[in-house]
Each structure stands twice: as structure tokens, then as C-alpha cells.
Regions:
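Long lumenal/extracellular ectodomains of secretory and single-pass membrane proteins
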Residues: 2-373, 389-537
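Metal-dependent nuclease catalytic cores in nucleic-acid-processing enzymes
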Residues: 378-394
């Protein structure tokens, strides 16, 4: 989805230590102030640009993110130049990596720091439409003047990404900047004769509407498909040639044929050839269209195929969202298998593990974004359910708010079923965030502790949080001491500036977001390795 390249767009008016000292969080409870690197990392991996969260408006959150990027870009460039490419490629977070690169480069140029700016821009752009997205954001935010570093970085991305298939997928009169506009603004040198012909076609089509399709074979095949009969179009979809030879997308095909051939015939023809993400996002549409058992069985087998899952690079919560959108039995098992394959790095942990999932109001009152049904509480339950399934009988899973509830996970129960049952209990023990009291109630000597939360906990009257200056909380009497040898893992899915985990002290760690890389970091720490930023591992 285009965020900035729209016709209506207008200019806008790990080192181990990640915290620096005590602070008060959004709930008035005790917490810790993140270091600038820790705060930026925590925020970046959970950031949906422009989206409100429970405690923070979208514009304030964006301003905090942009300010952190600008500060770190001039003060710790090697760190930031590792974070942003990792954010786009491994964490698969698109918009925050693009806007972050723009603010980083702008700040560095203003400070007279010129090295590596073009390379950073190129590294965060991984789809052809993102060139115009970045360019539009730059012009909206910083004005129409384009420094040479920006031109070079975008030129590198254009040569790498502007292909006939990309042009058919992403170039549209609905966008504020067409591909031809970008070419005219950046003046990239074509990679070869074929790309030079593509540039010429795009420019002619943009300005005169008479681009010669014979210059670009894929464009000619697309025009031929549109000129064919409905039955021939459907046949080309069914055998895959419309997608391979004509560069068609499911959106193109649906817009052209749905009203005339019917949704059932259309989805049955397209289903075997849909890109993986498009397939899992359209399961509900296929259910509503009433596709046959045979067609759905073939697609389900593909969804559950380990190689397809690995190639798709989908984050675990994508499968959860697919299940929430289309909870029918014909997809459930395939999605369960897919999510298991997507989490190969989930560790088998020796001994006993305590997992506490925050079910307070801030965790379930709204989705991750304006378009998402998945709430932070669902994602947290997903994390806990995965750990419990991978370690049967050795993980004790609890929800907590004002009180706690224990959630037993049956051996062999699917992760998605676990999440559904767990989140069905939200509200059972209130809607507050009594983190320290909850830990006191249920910690009884387990070998490690996970707390999955937005880390905005209520005050317990002691001013003590997830530290361990003397045992667990740090200072004063310890009703339930946790030895220094016990690792406490905080999984922060809020990204706020204040947190509950004091990572300055031994065996207290904080991760951000819910990618499977968190599990890889846990494995490394359990094996005795030092904590590192994920792109440095």
C-alpha cells in the first residue's frame, strides 16, 4: 500500500546496556529510561508509521522515532547503518525503514557527513514502488531539492528494481509520482539496452499515452491478454501464463473478470499461482466464493509446504491474522503447520520456564495498525503458545492484568487454537498491569522467566521493577527473590520510551517485537554468549 506516493500528499507542518536510569512510565508506575540506541531499537521494530497506540498518538510517536534516528545517525553511524537495512530485510518492516533512512541522510548531510548515505538509501529500498515512496516522503518532508546523495541512492535502486514486471505491477496513474516522473527527476543511467527500452516506453506512455508495447515483451503480452475473450483470459490464468508471461496480478484479474465469470471460477483459476502472501491474505475471499474442496486442498498443501513457508519470509503473526480472517477448518491445519515451519528457531529449553503474557487494556483495545485485527495481546499469546508447544510440560503459561490466570496448553494442541483459547480469557483478571505483584504470585523457582508486555506497568508501591540489584527487584526486602543466575527476558511489544526491564544488571534482557529472531537470541544467551544486536550476530 502506498503511504506517501499519493496525489493528495502535501508537505508536513546492542551493547548490553539499553537503559540509563529510573523513570516513570505512562501509567505512573516505576520504570527505566532507555538509552537512545535501546529506545530507537525498541521503537523501530514495533513501529507502524502514523498509527496511534494506546498511550501515544501517531504523530508524537513518529516525531520521537525521527528525532532518535537523526540523533543516532550523526553520533553512531555504524550502528544505524546496520539497524535500518536489517529492519527492512530481516524484520521485514517497510515504512519505518524508508522514513528512517530519509531522516538519517537528511541529518547527516546537514552535519557535513557524506559517506555511505547513498548506500543506505539503496539498502532499504527492496521493491520498485519504494523508490517513489522514498522520493515522495523526502519531497513532502524536506522539500523538492534533491541532494546528490539522494539521487545516487535512488539511482542505484532504480537500476536494480525497475523491470517490465515491476512496471506492470506498480506503475499507475493513481500514484502521485509515476515511474517516468521518477526517471526524469533522478536521471538514472540504464543498466542495459533492455532497461533503456523500458525507460523509453514508460516516458512515452506517461507523457503521450503512446508507448510502444513491442519495446517491452511483457507489456505486449499484457495487452494481448486484455484483448482476449473471457474464456481465454480464464484459461491463461488457470495455466499460469497470464501471471508468468503477461505479468498479471490477482488484483488486475479480479478487476477485469470477477463481474463476468463469477468469483468461484476466478479464484479456482488463480489459486495455484497466487504469491504466497496473497494466498494467505485471500483465504476468506476464497471461502466466500465457495471454491471447491479439490481447489482448497491443493492450496492448503501449498500453504503448509516447508519450502514455500521459508521462501515467503512471513512473520508469525501473518499466519495468525490469516486464521482470524478465515477460521474455517479447511485452512486451519495448513496454517498451523505453516506457523510451526516459520519458527524453526524456537528453542527447546531445559528445566522449567515461566511465561507471563500481559492481558491489560493497552494490549487488547486496538490492533497493531488501523487495518489489523491482530492485537498486541494476540501476538503475545502467540509467542507464549509457541514456547509452550515446543516445550511440552516444561512451560507454565499465565496471563496477567490486575491478577493472574494459568492457561494449560494441551500436548499436541495447535498454536493458533491455543491463542484463540487464551485470548478468549482476556478480562478474566481485570484490565490493569500489575506486573510485579503478578510475578510474586506465580514465580516459585522456575529456571527462567519471560514477560511479554508493552512494559507500562502500574506502581506496586515499592518503586521496584525488573531489576536485580539485590535479588530480583533491587533494594529492600525480597518476598520472592530471583537469583542473579536466573535469566529474565522481557519481550517489549510497545516500543514506548520507558520500559520495565533494567538491562544494566546481570541476566536481565529485553527484546523488541515478535520476530523469530528473538528465539535465536534466547538460544545464544542460554548458551552463554553475550547479548548482541541482531544484525551483529
Amino acid at each position: 500500500m502506498s503511504r506517501f506516493n499519493q496525489k493528495s500528499a502535501r508537505p508536513m507542518a546492542q551493547p548490553k546496556t539499553r537503559v540509563t536510569g529510573p523513570a516513570v512510565n505512562h501509567e505512573g508506575g516505576p520504570g527505566f529510561t532507555n538509552s537512545s540506541l535501546g529506545e530507537l531499537y525498541n521503537l523501530s521494530v514495533v513501529n507502524f508509521v502514523g498509527q496511534d497506540t494506546f498511550y501515544e498518538k501517531g504523530d508524537a510517536r513518529d516525531a520521537r522515532y525521527n528525532g532518535l534516528v537523526e540523533s543516532v545517525s550523526t553520533g553512531d553511524w555504524p550502528w544505524l547503518s546496520g539497524l535500518l537495512p536489517w529492519l527492512r530485510s530481516e524484520a521485514n518492516i517497510r515504512t519505518a525503514s524508508l522514513t528512517g533512512a530519509a531522516h538519517a541522510v537528511h541529518a547527516r548531510l546537514a552535519a557535513g557527513q557524506y559517506e555511505g548515505n547513498d548506500t543506505l538509501i539503496d539498502s532499504v529500498i527492496q521493491r520498485a514502488d519504494e523508490v517513489a515512496e522514498f522520493l515522495s516522503y523526502w519531497r513532502i518532508t524536506f522539500g523538492k531539492s534533491l541532494p546528490q546523495a539522494v539521487r545516487r541512492g535512488l539511482g542505484m535502486a532504480i537500476r536494480r528494481l525497475y523491470t517490465p514486471r515491476a512496471a506492470l505491477k506498480w506503475d499507475s496513474s493513481a500514484r502521485g509520482l509515476r515511474m517516468a516522473d521518477v526517471i526524469e527527476l533522478i536521471h538514472p543511467k540504464p543498466l542495459d539496452a533492455a532497461q533503456e527500452a523500458l525507460f523509453r516506453y514508460l516516458l512515452d506512455e506517461r507523457h503521450h499515452g503512446d508507448g510502444n508495447p513491442e519495446l517491452v515483451r511483457l507489456v505486449a503480452a499484457r495487452k494481448a491478454w486484455y484483448a482476449a475473450s473471457d474464456q481465454d483470459k480464464l484459461a491463461a490464468l488457470a495455466n499460469g501464463s497470464a501471471f508468468k508471461s503477461a505479468g498479471l496480478t490477482w488484483e488486475n484479474a479480479s478487476s477485469e473478470l470477477k463481474a463476468r465469470v463469477g468469483e468461484k471460477a476466478l479464484w479456482e483459476a488463480m489459486a495455484p499461482h497466487l504469491p504466497y502472501m496473497a494466498a494467505i491474505r485471500n483465504l476468506r475471499n476464497m471461502d466466500e466464493a465457495g471454491i471447491s474442496y479439490a481447489a482448497s486442498a491443493k492450496l492448503a498443501a501449498r500453504i503448509a509446504d516447508p519450502q514455500e513457508v521459508e521462501n515467503s519470509r512471513q512473520l508469525p503473526y501473518r499466519f495468525l491474522m490469516a486464521y482470524l480472517q478465515a477460521p474455517s477448518d479447511r485452512w486451519k491445519q495448513a496454517l498451523e503447520e505453516a506457523i510451526n515451519f516459520s519458527l524453526k528457531s524456537v528453542p527447546e529449553l531445559p528445566g522449567r520456564t515461566l511465561v507471563l503474557v500481559d492481558t491489560s487494556a493497552s494490549m487488547h483495545s486496538q490492533g497493531f495498525s488501523a487495518h489489523s485485527k491482530a492485537t498486541p495481546a494476540m501476538a503475545a499469546a502467540l509467542f507464549g503458545g509457541i514456547l509452550a508447544q515446543r516445550n511440552p510440560g516444561r512451560v507454565e503459561l499465565y496471563g496477567f492484568a490486575d491478577g493472574v490466570f494459568k492457561h494449560d496448553v494441551k500436548r499436541g494442541e495447535g498454536v493458533l487454537s491455543t491463542v484463540k483459547k487464551f485470548t478468549g480469557r482476556i478480562g478474566e483478571v481485570g484490565h490493569g498491569t500489575q506486573m510485579t505483584q503478578s510475578i510474586r504470585r506465580v514465580y516459585n523457582g522456575q529456571d527462567r522467566l519471560f514477560v511479554i508486555s508493552d512494559m507500562q506497568c502500574f506502581s506496586d508501591g515499592t518503586g521496584r521493577m525488573l531489576s536485580n540489584g539485590e535479588g530480583f527487584y533491587g533494594g529492600g526486602p525480597q518476598p520472592i527473590p530471583v537469583a542473579d543466575s536466573v535469566k529474565v527476558y522481557g519481550v517489549n511489544i510497545g516500543g514506548y520510551s520507558k520500559t520495565a526491564v533494567d538491562t544494566r544488571v546481570k541476566n536481565r534482557f529485553e527484546f523488541s517485537g515478535l520476530t523469530d529472531q528473538v528465539f535465536g537470541q534466547v538460544l545464544a544467551l542460554e548458551a552463554g554468549f553475550d547479548e548482541k544486536w541482531p544484525w551483529m550476530q
